[in-house]
Amino acid sequence: MKSFTFLAGLIFFSGVVAQSQSSGVSRKTGSLMDGTWSGTIMGIKLIFHFVTGPSGKTEGTMDSPQQGATGLPIKSVVVTVDSINCLLTTPMASYAAARLNDSTLAGRWSQGGRSTSLDLHRLSPTEAALYAPPHRPQTPTPPYPYHSDSVEYDNADKTVHLGATLTYPTKGGPFPAVILITGSGTQDRDETMFGHKPFAVIADYLTRRGYAVLRVDDRHAGLSTGDVSSKVTTEDFAKDVETSFAWLKAQKQIDAGRIGLIGHSEGAMIAPMVAATHKDVAFIISLAGPASGRETMIYQTLEPLKKFGASGDYIAYSMVREKIQLNNMLSATDSASFMKGVDSEYRAYLSALPDSMRRNYVLSPEKYEASLAPQTAMLMLDWWKFLLRYRAEDYYTKVKCPVLALGGEKDIQVPNASDLLFIDSTLKKAGNNKVTTRLVPGLNHLFQRCKNCTVAEYGQLEESFSPEALEVMGDWMDKNVKR
């Protein structure tokens, strides 16, 4: 799952992005924009990197340094002699600008139905060096010692088109296989975030160990399409995994009886959802999988406060605010009823507080509601309501295949210590003793060995995915999947 704020948009759990696909321009025209450009919107600096790719097309990425977001791929770039148009999927936004001269673009940034001015200025080589792409030594690069095929396929009624990469060994087969399932938000097949590509790292490692790996673009990322309206929930994304599962079973190089699922965060919610109704899923690996959507959201609010030394009173106050918000997200039918319910509960809570607390840090009802107002439309999405109601036990009680559940000890987005115990006990109570759980010391939500272990640190770390966690996964698969 994702958790990174971009301008007015929140993405639950582990912030991720879409795979870059660029539109065609000639090398000569594309080179007009090549370089690093900078602009500011709502006090937030944005950095655009444009380059002419091997095919002569302009490609781009965007950074938001203040938010710790780097390497956000631009889905399409269309360049003419005097203009540029960019489309992004995370955030869902666009940028259109006129080229005033070699160093200035005058344009508009559009996001969430709003448009605002955003002018970009080309940075000098010295300035651009400050925003150079971060070092990511684990990201695999060709040539690979295995097959790596770009594939595309549709769901049964052709309403969803999925783009993916299938990797598999050059010799032998048919191979045991696994589908990688991303966390929440719009993510590409590599689960790209902060310049890291953890799914590319996992796929490379497992393929070298003799497995086939399918990693898939989310809807509206990379080559994938499909409905992403306010009515779409995790259940719809589970159906996309079912589509991938059916496609993979039909491939001649794949052992159809040995296909499993590896899910990260929200993807680890989806894995048991699919396995509960598809008894031919051979195994599950859960990476930071939540036991309860509601409790995970509360944990995400409180754990950072504890980490930064907030007082007990302030933490208790924050918990009440969070619970008021969550209660009304479930009961409200629209933004107006949500705000009305929040106002009523919050005022009742304040009336019972001592004056000392109200004076120190408690927000007035007006300020509290003002802080929620920009988010209300997003909080009314069906996706959030499904998340709040999600309970892993509803699915794990029906899972009969082997399960490996891993969590990082330093994760501040999912309470792994308690959730791993819950997953273990739930499976065993349901008669499935083929479960292994492990809380890996020193790892964060992205399975990086961390120092400060904050969300802001994700992009500062060079490690994309812990070699220790990779080895645990590979060894477990060798024992439980290969035969």
Question: How does the language model describe each region?
Answer:
Residues G24-L100, A106-Q111, P145:
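Central antiparallel beta-sheet cores of small beta-barrel/beta-sandwich binding domains
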Residues A129-G173:
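N-terminal cap/lid segment of alpha/beta-hydrolase-fold proteins
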Residues P174-S184:
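Short beta-strand element of the alpha/beta-hydrolase
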Residues T192-V213:
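Short amphipathic alpha-helix adjacent to the substrate-entry channel of hydrolases
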Residues K231-K252:
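Alpha/beta-hydrolase active-site loop
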Residues L287-T397:
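Accessory cap/linker subdomain of secreted extracellular hydrolases
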Residues V399, A405-G407:
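Short beta-strand/loop motif that positions the catalytic acidic residue
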Residues I412-L420:
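Conserved alpha/beta-hydrolase "acid-adjacent" motif
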